Amino acid sequence: MAGKTYINNRDNDLSEGLKQLASYLNIPTGVIQAFKSECFVRRYNKGQIIYYSSDQPTYVYLLLDGIVLRETINEDGDAYRKLNKEQLLFPLNHLFRKIELNEMCTAITPCNVIGIPKDMLEYLCKNHDDIFVTLFEKLNNELELLMEYNMALTTKLARERIEKVLYYLCHAIGYDQDEFYEIKHIMTIQLLSDLAGISRETTGHIVHELKEEKKLIKNGKNWMVIK
């Protein structure tokens, strides 16, 4: 009986995951229902690796909930970090490409993902123009965020760089609460220091200044950034 319950729960999780995928792609669930047996839903604890480099090059993933850190390594060994929250399909830049993906994805909070065969999504793109257009728009949004982060890193003044990286985080993983952005569960001075490439001590001083100026409110790892 316990085994049957587990199978039913897993099937329900997969069905719900497919509904979220269909909503993300802006298509009826029936379009992807036929591929249900080829997909999977998994839960990852904080710190677990979801994929590393070309371990699973045949899948792309929709983050159903939680926050992940993706680190891409180029030919020179430089690492590029990206933080993503729920309702994001990744790695989109792996679609229609045969090259190895030098990327590691780690769960920063507990999270659930649905894995979708890469060739299945490519097939759907080729046969449904609206899916291709949707994914193209999503990829452009991701590239715009990456450009915002890269531009923040080119800023020479420490305070200005910290502020710009904070706003990048607001746009990437924050929640718009009208008068402020809220970044939940993960924010620390060390994380901000790492992402900005500025010492922890300097980052701490700047964060203190922002708090004094009422531009930032900290509640543990939940940070509120005033617009």
From Swiss-Prot:
Pfam families: cNMP_binding. GO terms for molecular function: cAMP binding; DNA binding; DNA-binding transcription factor activity. Keywords: Activator, cAMP, cAMP-binding, Cytoplasm, DNA-binding, Nucleotide-binding, Transcription, Transcription regulation. Its main location: cytoplasm. Residues 156-227 form the HTH crp-type domain. It is found in: Cytoplasm. Positively regulates the expression of the arcABDCR operon under anaerobic conditions, thus playing an essential role in arginine catabolism. May also control the expression of genes encoding proteins which are involved in anaerobic metabolism. Can bind cyclic AMP. PANTHER family: CRP FAMILY TRANSCRIPTIONAL REGULATORY PROTEIN, HTH-TYPE TRANSCRIPTIONAL REGULATOR ARCR. This is HTH-type transcriptional regulator ArcR. The gene is arcR.
